Amino acid sequence: MNLSVKLPGLNLKNPIMPASGCFGFGKEYSEYYDLSLLGGVMMKAATQFERLGNPTPRVAETSAGMLNAIGLQNPGVQQIIDHEVPRLAKYDTSIIANIAGSSIEEYEFVAASFNQTTDVDALELNISCPNVKEGGIQFGTDPFMAKKVTEVVKKASNKPVYVKLSPNVHNIVEMAKAVEEAGADGLSMINTLTGMKIHLPSRKPLIANKTGGLSGPAIKPVAIRMIYEVRQQVSIPIIGMGGITSAEDVLEYLIAGADAVAVGTANFQNPFVCVDIINELPEVLEQYGFNSIEDVIEKRGITV
């Protein structure tokens, strides 16, 4: 069965990618399976200079997901270009670089830096991280700022730009339309929902940042609803994410309006989850009457 999907800058052999922030740069997972099996790899966020991230503890389990406040820890864009991209480029898969910053100028610098390499196929513009004090969410909750940083990154880069949207907004359709008007080639949605968990004996938050981003199965219904709403109002492709653990979840995302998906938290529970989903997808598509991913996309839409 044909699982391929064509998106701006990305010829995916299948629609399955590990989500940025949940897969590092793929080094540990490459010890489990051949990364060439993946439709693509969304690398961990890159900033201009090295970031050490937030104080520990930075991760806490919840009943239906995970809270994290990593804080965009990364070695800096030049280290990523010099060491991580060449290693990933040995695999037959698409590479998407997630870019972040504390200012518009930093976003511009990081986006322009990735022009150094032809091995990066597209950029994912991270304006939705809830766990940093500067940058990130301040751009992702204001349509004017989201549009402005998208325009700057588009001018700085010769690669397609997918803007990662935050669910922590009043109107996500307004955000999606703003970045589409700014020239975004696609959307990634959704990032994590802001949450908190308290240790009862001490009455202290379980993570040092007090609040963190909630991911995992708990947020899937929110993501499906937001993708469905955005799909009715914008025409650019959507890479859907949030609580995907199975091939059935992937089909649900595609029907709601996504064109490809990214798998995040489930990688921590089962390092083979992406490969498992790729293997199970043909049977699930056939079960529900589809003969390819493009067939789902052409026929998608919910019945009422």
From Swiss-Prot:
- How is the cofactor bound, in the record's words? Binds 1 FMN per subunit.
Picking any one GO molecular function of the record gives: dihydroorotate dehydrogenase (NAD+) activity
Annotated GO biological processes are: 'de novo' pyrimidine nucleobase biosynthetic process; 'de novo' UMP biosynthetic process
Cofactor(s) essential for the protein: FMN
Q: Binding positions for substrate?
A: K44, N68, A69, I70, G71, L72, N126, N191, T192
EC number(s) stated in the UniProt entry for this protein: 1.3.1.14
Kindly report the protein's main subcellular placement as a broad class. Answer: cytoplasm
Keyword Cytoplasm listed = yes
User: Where does this one sit in the cell?
Assistant: Cytoplasm
Its cellular-component GO annotations read: cytoplasm
Q: Where does FMN bind?
A: S20, K44, A45, N98, N126, K164, I190, G216, G242, G243, G264, T265
* SUPFAM superfamilies, sorted: FMN-linked oxidoreductases (SSF51395)
Q: In which pathway does it act?
A: Pyrimidine metabolism; UMP biosynthesis via de novo pathway; orotate from (S)-dihydroorotate (NAD(+) route): step 1/1
According to its UniProt record, which residues of this chain constitute the active site? Answer: C129
State the source organism's domain of life: Bacteria
Keywords for this entry? Cytoplasm, Flavoprotein, FMN, NAD, Oxidoreductase, Pyrimidine biosynthesis
Catalytic reaction equation(s) = (S)-dihydroorotate + NAD(+) = orotate + NADH + H(+)
HAMAP family the UniProt entry points to:
DHO_dh_type1 (MF_00224)
Quaternary structure, from the entry: Heterotetramer of 2 PyrK and 2 PyrD type B subunits.
- Stated role: Catalyzes the conversion of dihydroorotate to orotate with NAD(+) as electron acceptor.
Similarity comment text for this entry: Belongs to the dihydroorotate dehydrogenase family. Type 1 subfamily.
| Matching PANTHER family | DIHYDROOROTATE DEHYDROGENASE (FUMARATE), DIHYDROOROTATE DEHYDROGENASE (QUINONE), MITOCHONDRIAL-RELATED
What NCBIfam families is this protein classified in? PRK07259.1, pyrD_sub1_fam
- The name this protein carries in UniProt is Dihydroorotate dehydrogenase B (NAD(+)), catalytic subunit
Native species: Oceanobacillus iheyensis (strain DSM 14371 / CIP 107618 / JCM 11309 / KCTC 3954 / HTE831)
Q: Which gene encodes it?
A: pyrD
